[in-house]
């Protein structure tokens, strides 16, 4: 998938007189320096609007779920990810939208808005793929190692912080893979919000612990997502570095 705003090149076919007299021969010329065609201002605004609406809608969903949870005396909190329980699909599906309390959700709000918006700017399709991969793969891995290193006994993993760590890892690694401004953006986000992520860890509702397992699994899933979703850009870069991109034979 190519994000909105990628550029394209063009070239011309040239007919030149043949050295043998008569007719013409096709020539191989480097592409004209037509420059890159940036996205229009309208497309840029639309992309920002779609990104903003997407992440704000998701955030509104989280607050709605927490409101329902509060009104039902935390009846939803038991639906998180629990180690090797047979209701694994249920836990993986709902754990990221559940939070122990309002403080837990508020602590995750700013990193979620910033990181989610940055990924959404790359396109709605890419945002959906990244989120789905971190959500499913990170949740599945947490289901496998959920109690590792825990001194509280069986744990119930809830909260969107695993997804946040996945998004952060994706931004950093994706930028390194494609060698574009994403790595700079990712590093800026890391320095700006890394302290928030480390200092305000999500709290599990009943055991008072930190789901470092969910954070770790989410981050690993983000790295995997970055590798898989950067394949088109990496392939294009490899072709350019191999010298197969220009000059081209114009026919």
Swiss-Prot record:
Main location: membrane
Transmembrane intervals: 48-68, 88-108, 110-130, 132-152, 158-178, 184-204, 209-229
Keyword Cell membrane on entry: yes
Name of the protein described by the UniProt record: Uncharacterized protein ML1171
Signal peptide extent: none
Pfam families the UniProt entry points to: Rhomboid
Family in the record: To M.tuberculosis Rv1337.
One Gene Ontology molecular-function label: serine-type endopeptidase activity
Cysteine pairs bridged by disulfides in the record: none
Cellular component terms per the entry's GO annotation: plasma membrane
InterPro entries named in the record: Peptidase_S54_rhomboid_dom, Rhomboid-like_sf, Rhomboid_protease_S54
Annotated localization: Cell membrane
Membrane topology: Multi-pass membrane protein
Keywords (A to Z) from UniProt: Cell membrane, Membrane, Transmembrane, Transmembrane helix
Coiled-coil annotated spans: none
